[in-house]
């Protein structure tokens, strides 16, 4: 009698597959394990099942991809205002990942790559938009500073270092990196000094744009492995950048004047449109009329502008928007500081006039949302320093006088209220 469960007969001679029951003579290979045997046919069958499941997952990737409306809703949770930019980004990102899905199928129509250019003042939310997109889509994300980049062979970072940073974010998983998002900040700082080609070599301006061309359009970049130059004998990793979404951002100070000059030239003499002082448009409204020729005039080379077909402009944040940024988003600064104080068992309250005072201060400094944390950190520094050593504190209150530096945060103790700073106790 044969014991098929153990893969042996009573005599201990003939072996059987524990899954399909075939003997060792009916299959090419029988692999032994602890009290179990598996034949090559069952191994191949398992591989086929796994392969089919992976194909089903990749074919349904488009179904799992958030729709533009859903992408916009998530952006609304973290970014205040900038409705036009959110809509442009939602559509561009959706189409980009639909393009990657279509790329795996053979079709007559080949979808071209649509990288994104974000134009807006400092602190308007360019970086936060890109970060939120990457976090929502669960793809690798890295930020590169264009001002540190130079042409290959010169002192500074090579453009290939951008891809290496992306690989580091996903533990050198090439497949994941090839679907990541790269945000290149301060791209306006690599504009050439004049719109006429320079005789001298511009290694940190036009040279960087030239170096970025192929990377952004889609090429196979050779990136050193984890060891880098310490292990030169290792083979370089080959990364196809065709599926990587590149988002370039910059303040482009003075671009509004370039746009105005172009629009004013369009109407001279009797056909000129005369505008009163009241009809003067804001910088944000002017930037919405940006054309590729304006970017070329500003200092970007035509080929580089052509690689960034999707352009989204962001408006300068007003006082009300800054107040909302302080308190409304999921990870708003006020909520973050309230969480820190809550860990000490203390309630932190910001009054409405305090939030407006912080917003006005940020506007005076022209730092946008980026300067809000600096202001709050300065205001709460002494309180956060002394609070862990204090007892019986129930609440800390901040009003506009505290923001203006006229007084310190009010400390409310258990069963009594005292108007004194944490540092005075």
Swiss-Prot record:
Subunit description? Component of the ClpX-ClpP complex. Forms a hexameric ring that, in the presence of ATP, binds to fourteen ClpP subunits assembled into a disk-like structure with a central cavity, resembling the structure of eukaryotic proteasomes.
Give the protein family.
Answer: Belongs to the ClpX chaperone family.
Q: Which GO terms describe its cellular component?
A: HslUV protease complex
- The residues listed in the UniProt record as binding ATP, with positions renumbered to this chain, are 121-128
Protein keywords: ATP-binding, Chaperone, Metal-binding, Nucleotide-binding, Zinc
Q: NCBIfam families under this entry?
A: clpX, PRK05342.1
Summarize where Zn(2+) binds, as residue positions: 17, 20, 39, 42
Q: Which InterPro entries does the UniProt entry name for this protein?
A: AAA+_ATPase (IPR003593), ATP-dep_Clp_protease_ClpX (IPR050052), ATPase_AAA_core (IPR003959), Clp_ATPase_C (IPR019489), Clp_protease_ATP-bd_su_ClpX (IPR004487), ClpX_bact (IPR046425), P-loop_NTPase (IPR027417), Znf_CppX_C4 (IPR010603)
Q: What does this protein do?
A: ATP-dependent specificity component of the Clp protease. It directs the protease to specific substrates. Can perform chaperone functions in the absence of ClpP.
Source gene?
clpX
Q: Which BP terms in the Gene Ontology apply to this protein? A: cell division; proteolysis involved in protein catabolic process
Q: Which GO terms describe its molecular function?
A: ATP binding; ATP hydrolysis activity; ATP-dependent protein folding chaperone; protein dimerization activity; unfolded protein binding; zinc ion binding
What is the designated name of this protein? ATP-dependent Clp protease ATP-binding subunit ClpX
- The organism named in the record is Alkalilimnicola ehrlichii (strain ATCC BAA-1101 / DSM 17681 / MLHE-1)
């Amino acid at each position: 009698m044969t014991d098929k469960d153990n893969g042996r007969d009573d005599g201990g001679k003939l072996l059987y597959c524990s899954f399909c029951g075939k003997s060792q003579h009916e299959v090419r290979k029988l692999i032994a394990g602890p009290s179990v045997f598996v034949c090559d046919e069952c191994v191949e069958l398992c591989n086929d099942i796994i392969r089919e499941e992976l194909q089903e997952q990749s074919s349904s990737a488009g179904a799992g991809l958030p729709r533009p409306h859903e992408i916009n809703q998530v952006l609304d949770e973290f970014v205040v205002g900038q409705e036009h930019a959110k809509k442009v980004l939602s559509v561009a990102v959706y189409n980009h990942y639909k393009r990657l899905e279509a790329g795996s199928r053979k079709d007559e129509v080949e979808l071209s790559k649509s990288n994104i250019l974000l134009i807006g003042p400092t602190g308007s939310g360019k970086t936060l938009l890109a970060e939120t997109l990457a976090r929502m889509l669960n793809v690798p994300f890295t930020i590169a500073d264009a001002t540190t980049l130079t042409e290959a062979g010169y002192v500074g970072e090579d453009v290939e270092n951008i891809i290496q940073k992306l690989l580091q974010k996903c533990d050198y998983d090439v497949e994941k990196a090839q679907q990541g998002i790269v945000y290149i900040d301060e791209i306006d700082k690599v504009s050439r000094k004049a719109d006429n080609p320079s005789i001298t070599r511009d290694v940190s301006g036009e040279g960087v744009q030239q170096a970025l061309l192929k990377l952004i359009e889609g090429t196979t970049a050779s990136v050193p492995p984890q060891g880098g130059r310490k292990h030169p004998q290792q083979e370089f990793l080959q990364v196809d950048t065709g599926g990587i979404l590149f988002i370039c951002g910059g303040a482009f100070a003075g671009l509004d004047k370039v746009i105005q000059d172009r629009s004013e030239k369009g109407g001279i003499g009797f056909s000129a449109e005369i505008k009163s002082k009241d009809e003067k448009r804001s910088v944000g409204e002017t930037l919405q009329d940006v054309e590729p020729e304006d970017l070329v005039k500003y200092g970007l080379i035509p080929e580089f502008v052509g690689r960034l077909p999707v352009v989204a402009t962001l408006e300068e944040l007003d006082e009300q928007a800054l107040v909302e940024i302080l308190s409304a988003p999921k990870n708003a600064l006020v909520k973050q500081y309230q969480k820190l104080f809550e860990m000490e068992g203390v309630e932190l309250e910001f009054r409405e006039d305090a939030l407006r005072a912080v917003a006005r201060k940020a506007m005076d400094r022209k730092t946008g949302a980026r300067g809000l944390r600096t202001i709050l950190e300065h205001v709460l520094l002494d309180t956060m320093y002394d609070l862990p050593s204090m007892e019986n504190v129930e609440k800390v209150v901040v009003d506009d006088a505290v923001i203006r530096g006229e007084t310190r945060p009010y400390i409310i103790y258990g069963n009594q209220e005292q108007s004194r700073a944490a540092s005075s106790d």
